[in-house]
């Protein structure tokens, strides 16, 4: 597993203006879903632009272990021959998802609809993360889950339901992972499986299910929520998938370009799904010079080209209802806030506490060790921006790729270099991050 590797520290130094054009890796969320739905479909699914980070590769290995034929045919080009809904076979060994909560939780939903037994495991970070929120609805649908750890944590054994039940389920928190696990399990159940969420979470699973031929209806629910109804037991058909560039990965060069004076970069093919654009909305409110063009789409997912220039940023208040659309971007938003003039308040960040690390505490620690005034008030993060960051600190990454990349972006514009204690986990989502940033002019060493 990745956590057995020796730490690989890295320092980011104040850089000259960043320039150039880049395409960040394929979207991680869509890459996981393309592999899983391709495995549940009948026939061939061709995927181009797949993210070839460790998290997604572990999902590919899991689908192969469950009986699908999964092969790499070229650079970021993959082919999946699926086994059909409820067609998974019992794997010979535990399914190891490494650091990937998304891959693990979505696969649990997919397996829950097949009459097999599979053991799910991961690295130390994933073993520490809560799984009960996924286990509870799957057990309502007829699956049986056994875990020796408190809170239903990994490793756990999941016995899929022989006769899955359709359910109506209200998610306890806004979570695309919970919703997706229930919908994937619902593929095997007769009748209609319904998920209701009080705050709309990212809808990649719904869009891709439609792309593969499922009947799924989405309706508004209250002020900000959604009701999603899936008709079970469809025959999913293999379909081509073009994976757009990941907006969560694009966030790091984007913020780096905003805070390094004189920068002017372009990022191509970035997904612009409205449930993933909270960061861009917030940065524009802060005064960021971000322009989009060449808007188009594939498999229901829109994408665009972004031009990003060095900008004078100001502090803003970020409302809690925006959290689901940018839950993975708050770390790097905090970096932008540190370079802004004035106070930025980010509200309602409780979900950051159960990510790869306690990202709320880790973000505050990252800023404090580099001389930025920051406060945690309940689930709110308050950053006092002074227009510059002193830097000079060593950031503990806690095996979290997004902490590492956020800290490195900060170091490119801080007064003194910023060091991260380990960059190994960047490979889970963005293996080419360091060389790509160096091509744009970033100073690492």
Curated annotation (Swiss-Prot):
CDD domains listed in its UniProt record: EPSP_synthase
The record ties this protein, via Pfam families, to:
EPSP_synthase
Q: What is this enzyme's catalytic activity, as reactions?
A: 3-phosphoshikimate + phosphoenolpyruvate = 5-O-(1-carboxyvinyl)-3-phosphoshikimate + phosphate
Instruction: Fetch the PROSITE patterns from UniProt.
Output: EPSP_SYNTHASE_1, EPSP_SYNTHASE_2
Q: What is its EC number?
A: 2.5.1.19
Highest taxon above the source species:
Bacteria
Membrane-crossing residue ranges in chain numbering:
none
* The keyword Glycosyltransferase appears for this protein: no
State the pathway, as annotated in the record: Metabolic intermediate biosynthesis; chorismate biosynthesis; chorismate from D-erythrose 4-phosphate and phosphoenolpyruvate: step 6/7
Q: What is this protein called?
A: 3-phosphoshikimate 1-carboxyvinyltransferase
Q: What are the recorded Gene Ontology BP terms? A: amino acid biosynthetic process; aromatic amino acid family biosynthetic process; chorismate biosynthetic process
**Family per record:** Belongs to the EPSP synthase family.
Sites where the protein binds 3-phosphoshikimate: 28-29, 33, 175, 177, 328, 355
What are the record's GO terms for cellular component? cytoplasm
Q: Which residues bind phosphoenolpyruvate?
A: 28, 101, 129, 177, 359, 402
An annotated Gene Ontology molecular function: 3-phosphoshikimate 1-carboxyvinyltransferase activity
List of catalytic residues: 328 (proton acceptor)
What's the subunit arrangement here? Answer: Monomer.
Q: Which stretches are annotated as coiled coil?
A: none
Ranges for region Disordered: 1-25
Which keywords does this chain's UniProt record carry? Amino-acid biosynthesis, Aromatic amino acid biosynthesis, Cytoplasm, Transferase
Starting at the broadest rank, the lineage of the source organism is: Bacteria, Pseudomonadati, Pseudomonadota, Alphaproteobacteria, Hyphomicrobiales
Its annotated function is as follows:
Catalyzes the transfer of the enolpyruvyl moiety of phosphoenolpyruvate (PEP) to the 5-hydroxyl of shikimate-3-phosphate (S3P) to produce enolpyruvyl shikimate-3-phosphate and inorganic phosphate.
